[in-house]
Swiss-Prot record:
It comes from Shewanella frigidimarina (strain NCIMB 400). This is D-aminoacyl-tRNA deacylase. A motif (Gly-cisPro motif, important for rejection of L-amino acids) lies at residues 137-138. GO terms for cellular component: cytoplasm. An aminoacyl-tRNA editing enzyme that deacylates mischarged D-aminoacyl-tRNAs. Also deacylates mischarged glycyl-tRNA(Ala), protecting cells against glycine mischarging by AlaRS. Acts via tRNA-based rather than protein-based catalysis; rejects L-amino acids rather than detecting D-amino acids in the active site. By recycling D-aminoacyl-tRNA to D-amino acids and free tRNA molecules, this enzyme counteracts the toxicity associated with the formation of D-aminoacyl-tRNA entities in vivo and helps enforce protein L-homochirality.
Length: 145
């Protein structure tokens, strides 16, 4: 399971020119789910995302997590993160989860974050989405479990 997280001042995701998810300060999470992923991996990654210290403290050091800054999450499914790009000039998605498995784990990730008290918005699983964001930094991390 892969989470490409970006610290943002604000972000939104639209489907058919309609905003379906929108946050202010927080993290945009592009979530890629692979065939070998399961609930245990989801909990581990969601916990890491929520607690990852990527926000600056009073000394300008990345030392604060999402809750400590009152941040929000915008979680967007992105199966292309599971691509194998090692060979040739075309990505292979053989490592990506099936749509059914990915949807189940995506929804579980979102629900887990909400249960932890994090205000969490989402995109629409499987849809063609447009994501807009204002990067803060930019600060981007690729987290994997």
């Amino acid at each position: 399971m892969i989470a490409l997280i970006q610290r943002v001042k604000r972000a939104s995701v639209s489907v058919d020119n309609t905003i379906v998810g929108k946050i202010d300060q927080g993290l945009l999470v592009l979530l890629g789910i692979e065939r070998e992923d399961n609930i245990e991996k989801m909990v581990k990654l969601a916990t890491k995302v929520i607690n990852y210290r990527v926000f600056s403290d009073e000394d300008g050091k990345m030392n604060l997590n999402l809750a400590q800054v009152g941040g929000q999450l915008l979680v967007v499914s992105q199966f292309t993160l599971a691509a194998d790009t090692g060979k040739g000039l075309r990505p292979s998605f053989s490592c990506a989860a099936t749509p059914e498995q990915a949807d189940r784990l995506y929804l579980a990730f979102v629900e887990y974050c909400r249960q932890q008290g994090v205000m969490t918005q989402t995109g629409q699983f499987g849809a063609d989405m447009q994501v807009e964001l204002v990067n803060d930094g930019p600060v981007t991390f690729n987290l994997q479990v």
